[in-house]
């Protein structure tokens, strides 16, 4: 069974692909930049995995469909929420180009992971865009399965990392009114379970042309999620609700207090006043699995972080994670017309120790010279709309092309 995964370098894609391969599926991973895909993590499945390059915002960059095998299922995991104010237009264009690209090819099923958008409520640009993408995908010839998720909790997810940033760093929080909004957080493990279940050959016909809400076993407010994290960590935190923080001020609060970018903070805040609880739960009967509680999700995420086994993080998945091809063309040091200055020094360390030290730069390790100046540089970066130094790095010892490294982006590793 051949499965196409778009957004394969994203937060969900990098967690879904190993599970698909483990189950014996042949996977076509579609990415914008092959250099960013961690192919070294898939050595044992290299016979089942093909990585293809293409940008759905640039239809001319997509590979010819006659090079594709018949596709039994295609996961649509693309989003542009971190791209700025024009992300709704970008998301619609991506969906239209996806449908147009696969139109000549036999396709058994499309699976789309979106967000819960309550009927009868005025939607934010973020949630309206998610609903628009679903409508565009439904115009294709293949049956569409739409999964609508509430807040996804897992190591490296935007929601988990924002909550962790706030609770770990702020003993006292003055929180906006939207922290009393209800949601139904779901563990990333359960999300992957549902994504796998809807293409299972003996069950998939139950999900054709259907929309299914997925959530965890608890209804919580965002304040309860902050308090729940503090309880798991054994931290005393005081939360003081403030009714007068505007959406713009709330976005700035998230931006300066966490590692999130301002476009993402603005998009998130615009949706956080809307309740995202499941309106139906049919999928729990069709795909039975043990749903982790919010506390269990946090404990599992913290365990993965502590063991340095985080396979993907949200800030490596945004549009900014794509390395411009112009940078790649200029990666080689020129041989002519430059002054070459070569220096040597003797170190009381083995070759491997030196290599490990270089690959561990940044993040919690910091920088070996004038570390305070790098932190000052991070503050300056944050003040002009950059990411600052808070996002650190995905793994303390490993780097891949496209990874975030404090306020840097790795262009070759």
Please report, for each region that a protein language model flagged, where it lies by residue:
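N-terminal Rossmann NAD(P)H-binding glycine-rich loop of SDR-like oxidoreductase domains
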Residues: 1-25
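SDR active-site strand-loop-helix element
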Residues: 6, 30, 77, 110-115, ...
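Oxidoreductase cofactor-interface core, primarily capturing Rossmann-like NAD(P)-dependent enzymes
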Residues: 16, 23, 40, 121-235, ...
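Conserved glycine-rich Rossmann-like NAD(P)H-binding loop of the short-chain dehydrogenase/reductase
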Residues: 25-33
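NAD(P)H-binding glycine-rich loop region in Rossmannoid oxidoreductase-like domains
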Residues: 35, 43-105, 115-120
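A short helix->loop->beta-strand "cap" motif at the edges of active sites that frequently abuts
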Residues: 104-109, 141-142
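A hydrophobic C-terminal alpha-helical subdomain
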Residues: 245-336, 384, 388, 395-398
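Glycine-rich portal/gate segments that line the openings of hydrophobic small-molecule binding cavities
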Residues: 338-339, 346-413
């Amino acid at each position: 069974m051949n499965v196409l995964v778009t957004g394969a370098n994203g937060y969900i894609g990098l967690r879904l692909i190993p599970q698909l391969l483990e189950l014996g599926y042949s996977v076509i991973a579609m990415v914008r930049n092959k250099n960013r895909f961690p192919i070294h993590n898939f050595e044992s499945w290299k016979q089942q995995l093909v990585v293809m390059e293409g940008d759905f915002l640039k239809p001319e960059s997509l590979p010819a469909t006659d090079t594709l095998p018949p596709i039994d299922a295609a996961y649509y995991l693309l989003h542009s929420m971190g791209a700025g104010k024009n992300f709704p237009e970008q998301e619609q264009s991506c969906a239209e180009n996806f449908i147009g690209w696969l139109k000549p090819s036999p396709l058994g099923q499309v699976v789309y992971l979106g967000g819960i958008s309550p009927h009868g409520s005025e939607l934010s640009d973020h949630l309206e865009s998610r609903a628009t993408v679903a409508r565009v995908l439904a115009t294709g010839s293949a049956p569409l399965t739409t999964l609508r998720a509430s807040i996804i909790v897992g190591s490296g997810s935007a929601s988990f990392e924002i909550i962790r940033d706030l609770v770990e760093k702020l003993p006292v929080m003055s929180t906006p009114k939207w922290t009393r909004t209800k949601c139904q957080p779901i563990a990333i493990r359960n999300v992957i379970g549902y994504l796998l279940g809807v293409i299972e050959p003996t069950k998939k016909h139950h999900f054709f042309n259907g929309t299914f809400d997925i959530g965890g076993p608890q209804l919580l407010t965002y304040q309860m999620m902050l308090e729940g994290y503090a309880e798991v960590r054994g931290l005393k935190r005081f939360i003081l609700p403030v009714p007068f923080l505007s959406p713009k001020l709330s976005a700035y609060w998230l931006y300066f207090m966490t590692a999130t970018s301002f476009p993402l903070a603005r998009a998130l805040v615009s949706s956080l006043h809307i309740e995202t609880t499941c309106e139906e739960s049919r999928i729990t009967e069709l795909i039975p699995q043990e749903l982790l509680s919010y506390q269990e999700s946090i404990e599992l995420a913290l365990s993965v972080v502590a063991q340095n086994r985080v396979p993907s993080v949200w800030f490596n998945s945004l549009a900014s994670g794509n390395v411009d091809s112009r940078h790649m063309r200029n990666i080689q040091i020129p041989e002519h017309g430059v002054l070459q200055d070569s220096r040597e020094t003797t170190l009381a360390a083995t070759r491997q120790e030196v290599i490990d030290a270089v690959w561990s730069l940044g993040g919690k390790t910091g920088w070996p010279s004038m570390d305070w100046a790098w932190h000052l540089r991070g503050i300056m970066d944050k003040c002009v709309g950059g990411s600052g130094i808070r996002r650190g790095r995905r793994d303390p010892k490993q780097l891949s092309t496209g990874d975030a490294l404090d306020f840097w982006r790795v262009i070759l590793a």
